[in-house]
């Protein structure tokens, strides 16, 4: 299995170094649900600004304030503790009376707004996240500037970030140990983390191998292509390659890579043979995913940051702004810009 730090770069390994998240204010995330609260219903959506607090801790504190069970507070995605983040929490509080959430106090947190909503906010039910990052102590401004220009055109690999695999790769190691035994894993959180790490690692490896090709965005016979921003996909045939290539070049279509599991992977012929060869040695993880009935799926191979802009404060400090769809990792963008020093853990899902 390829170590995360050794995964293939789309734009080549960065020439310079820089500091990511020298302080929480250098990493700002604003959650974009893609919809507004209904204004009525048994749930309350609460938009919270937090600094130095993880999502679960704040959710538990909100439940305690509202005198409800912790399971009655949900959220669309986990946000990094060591960052300034805006996100929505959802509390089930039936009844006509609206609690005064402006009285909710927790160090590092501030309630920005709240309103009634008809439906529970479920994990993954967000459109994306807007990021404002500050990279400090940049050692090679010219290299970073050119990479930002190139990313606007060619995007970045849509890798799952290192944090998906746990501290020191602990989640992936857990998956490997589990794969080597038939011992049931009763802890639901461990099951989820380990299976996710296994599938993510296989996806990353397939993408890393594809990126070694001379033209990474060249459609081949049997590729599974996805309409940009959609989850559905279809298989490319030889007769359509020229037209499909034009649509990929126009970013209308995206080449996908496998999230291996049970059932068909989605690709056929040449593309399927390539994906299977890329992870041929990882039989234990593949067997685990099939054994635990994790269905195979697809994920775009490349990621195009939207609304990408940047501003150099001085020759060694740059502020970068961009928007990513749910499930994408900001560190996949940063990884193509600099060799980072400091904390490298942030998830946007």
Curated annotation (Swiss-Prot):
E.C. designation(s): 5.4.99.27
UniProt key word Manganese: no
One GO BP: tRNA pseudouridine synthesis
Catalytic activity, reaction form: uridine(13) in tRNA = pseudouridine(13) in tRNA
Binding-site residues for substrate, renumbered to this chain: 27, 129, 329
Ranges where the TRUD domain occurs: 155-303
Pfam families: TruD
Residues the record marks as active site: 80
Matches recorded under InterPro entries: PsdUridine_synth_cat_dom_sf, PsdUridine_synth_TruD, PsdUridine_synth_TruD_CS, PsdUridine_synth_TruD_insert, TruD_catalytic, TruD_insert_sf, TruD_pseudoU_synthase
PROSITE patterns named in the record: TRUD, UPF0024
One GO MF term attached to the UniProt entry: RNA binding
PANTHER family: TRNA PSEUDOURIDINE SYNTHASE D
Function field: Responsible for synthesis of pseudouridine from uracil-13 in transfer RNAs.
Protein name: tRNA pseudouridine synthase D
Native source species: Escherichia coli O6:H1 (strain CFT073 / ATCC 700928 / UPEC)
Taxonomic lineage: Bacteria, Pseudomonadati, Pseudomonadota, Gammaproteobacteria, Enterobacterales
